[in-house]
Amino acid sequence: MIVLDSSFLIGFYNERDAHHAAASTLMDRFLAGTWGKGLLLEYIFLEITTVLMLRRDLSVATRVGRILLDAEELEFVPCSDLFSQTIETFSNQAGTRLSFADAAIASVARSRADGQILSFDEEFKKLASLRINPDST
């Protein structure tokens, strides 16, 4: 399993994004089963659809949201049960500036995905327990 971050998914779905080419390569590997099933946190779904609506339009955001929710390669992870753990991770971070959603990603990656995350967020690289875009070189 691997946790998917909004920077990866937005990079893939927004052809104008600076990370589009790299995200497309990673997506090919993900869809080929390199890391197994992807974990899509509720918080990340909210980020993706909001950003795509603002940067593109509502129809793009809605279409991508539906693709993500219907994808057999993804497991949707509701975040209500993760809230207390995420508060701890967020509040006790040192040497990083993880957003609340990123703190949830870090927690889930550690507990369910052997620390693996698909992301272009440099803050994750500061955490030794995480592996960002594993074997992507």
In which residue ranges do the predicted regions lie?
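Short acidic, glycine/proline-enriched helix-loop-strand junctions
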Residues: 62, 67-81, 93-95, 124-137
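Metal-dependent nucleic-acid phosphoesterase active-site entry motif
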Residues: 1-18
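Acidic, PIN/NYN-like endoribonuclease modules and their adjacent C-terminal/linker elements
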Residues: 1, 106-107, 111-137
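A generic structural signal for short hydrophobic patches within well-formed alpha-helices
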Residues: 9, 45, 124-125
